[in-house]
Amino acid sequence: NEILKKQGLLGEGAQTEEKTADTAVTVAEPVTVDANVRAAINTMVKHGLGDTATAEAGFTDIEETLTSIKQLRLNASAFEEEIKYLKGRTFTAPVQISGKAEVDGDTLTYEVVQRNAMKLFKNPRTGRAIKQLNFNIPTLVWKNDKGAVTQHPMVPMPVDHYQFRATHLIKFLTAFIMGKNVWCHGHTGTGKTTLPEQVAAVIQFPVFPINLDGNIERADLVGQMNIVNDGGTSITQFKEGILPRAMVQPCFLVLDEIDVGKPDVMFVIQRATEGKGLLLTEDGGRLVKPNPLFRFVATANSRGQGDEYGVYAGVRPMNGALLNRFPIFIEVDYMTKEEESAFLKKTYGIADEVIDNITTFAGMCRKAFSEGETTVPVSPRDTMAMCEMYNFFEGIFPTKAQAMEFAVTTSVIDRAPMDNRQRIVELADRCFASCKFTATIS
């Protein structure tokens, strides 16, 4: 901790876990030597060095000397690991110790606690630690006005059995501790927004989402002057938008569908992502300085270079200067069949055969979508809906086939456009042989 403080990476009073890295020194087992050999070596050393030199060298016994050498090697190995660990802290961003946040008229206080990321996030497949995450990350502890630990209303709830991917975590958390913004891109329904939400759920960070594909205007982001009644007198007062309110807090500001945002809105975001603060010209030139733990997370169907797939209307190329403000790009793809099957099995407890049919159907629909055959991507939300519907209808319909047929039709087929529906039905027929699907409106 003292080393981290000297580097400016840990403020006075900030907490860390007692052990910052798994580098505890092991005590060496005593080395044993055959009694005859031991006596002979001791005699040879003392005879060769002489009594005075032997005493100066601190030699008393060959077993003690060999045990000391063994211990030195263990100490050196542990020291190398600690140096490697501390070097990883060199480029981390400044960390705040504590602060306050206004939430729905109440004041919550937060305390920053440094925790080892490797202990917070496990490999979902093996349940083992991800060794590349052996570094500290700031987490938050929220308290109400009475000092009791509480939950910030904008901190997402954890999703049971959520499947983190090691590569996503390494990139996202590295960007987080270095103070960098992240750009998550991928097809519809891959979990681009869920990734920062579930990271935030673990480290107790609030998430403020802004959907940029709607009718959001510049004033919604920055704020505007409003006329208010002050004791019978009408006065103008500046009302802050989401940007200045979020920037002063430790949080993730998620810019959903950033690649379809309006140009004037994008220029405001570009200015804010520079990290130097936001100048509110509408409020007399007031400068809003960002909290050291404030981060932007963008989600998009593209890498910012326009629609690569030809299926996302409204996606436009982004300004190069804006893209430079997001140095970390994470491609979020659909879960593999194995990952999705494991998730659905743990969540819904459905028979393996049913899970296999659902995930196979989802995979075929996604392939058809990516190849331009349909405009219906079957997302993990859709596979979850099919499982939920199947569990419900299984207790109502006389056969499991009818329950499955109704679940698939309700969750996927009914929302498909008519020019896509026949292809979706063909894929469903191939995956659910005992069911009878139709492309006509039911």
List the model feature ranges, each with a label.
Residues 1, 7, 34-37, 41-48, ...:
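Heptad-repeat positions
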Residues 78, 82-356:
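AAA+ P-loop NTPase catalytic core and its hallmark functional loops
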Residues 334-336, 340-406:
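Conserved AAA+ ATPase small/helical "lid" subdomain
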Residues 396-442:
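C-terminal engagement/docking regions of AAA+ P-loop ATPases
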Residues 12-35, 57, 96:
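Acidic, proline-/serine-/threonine-rich low-complexity intrinsically disordered repeat tracts
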